[in-house]
């Protein structure tokens, strides 16, 4: 039995199964267009042709949101002028809900929500997205550092729905720490203990002191 709200997505999946394209399509909604989000969108635009020809990956940015409004096109947005599109949408918009905006992807196959904010409001919609079969990739640390039960629920929902909940950049300044630990566990290793200086600031200070830089100069 297929829920009515999942009918369109199901038809898209069946269509792809019977009429396979040579390219895999990934539909992406980027929330946050500050330093991180803007760089991500620029990289996607620059690498679009390379990903398509070398990886057979058609990466469509179908949605972009800032703190005030969002733009959405299921066929893919033009990234060269997305800031102007956001301004135009902001001028004519009558209210804005990031949850409603992101859930427009619910009927798109292979849909991914990318959170480049530090917003508690945005992180609060992850569960709804995962329940609607939308993967979540986040640089926002709030959800993964929230109550443990909520964190486990997010991971379990992603597993049950066959989608991804990824947060690699939450720790280690973007180093592949979480992925490495997962690979070790998946290959049968048992993690007994992890020792680390978890503060990036302290790591910087220690490195400077080790290079004989005076403490007073290091923290200046």
Per-range role (PLM):
Residues 119-132, 141-184:
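Rossmann-fold NAD(P)-binding glycine/threonine-rich loop
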Residues 180-220:
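Conserved anion/nucleotide-ligand pocket segment
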């Amino acid at each position: 039995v297929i829920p009515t709200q999942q009918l369109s997505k199901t038809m898209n999946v069946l269509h792809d199964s019977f009429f396979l394209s040579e390219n895999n399509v990934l539909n992406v909604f980027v929330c946050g267009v500050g330093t991180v989000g803007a760089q991500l969108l620029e990289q996607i635009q620059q690498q679009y042709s390379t990903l398509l020809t070398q990886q057979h990956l058609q990466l469509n940015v179908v949605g972009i949101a800032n703190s005030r409004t969002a733009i959405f096109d299921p066929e893919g947005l033009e990234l060269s002028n997305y800031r102007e599109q956001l301004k135009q949408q902001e001028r004519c918009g009558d209210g804005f809900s990031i949850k409603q905006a992101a859930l427009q992807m619910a009927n798109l196959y292979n849909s991914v929500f990318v959170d480049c904010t530090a917003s508690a409001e945005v992180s609060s919609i992850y569960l709804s997205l995962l329940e609607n079969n939308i993967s979540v990739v986040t640089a926002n640390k709030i959800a993964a550092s929230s109550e443990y039960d909520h964190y486990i629920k997010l991971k379990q929902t992603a597993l049950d729905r066959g989608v991804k909940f990824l947060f690699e950049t939450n720790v280690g300044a973007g180093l592949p720490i979480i992925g490495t630990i997962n690979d070790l566990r998946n290959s049968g290793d048992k993690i007994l203990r992890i020792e680390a200086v978890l503060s990036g600031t302290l790591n910087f200070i220690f490195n400077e002191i080790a290079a004989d830089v005076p403490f007073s100069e290091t923290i200046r």
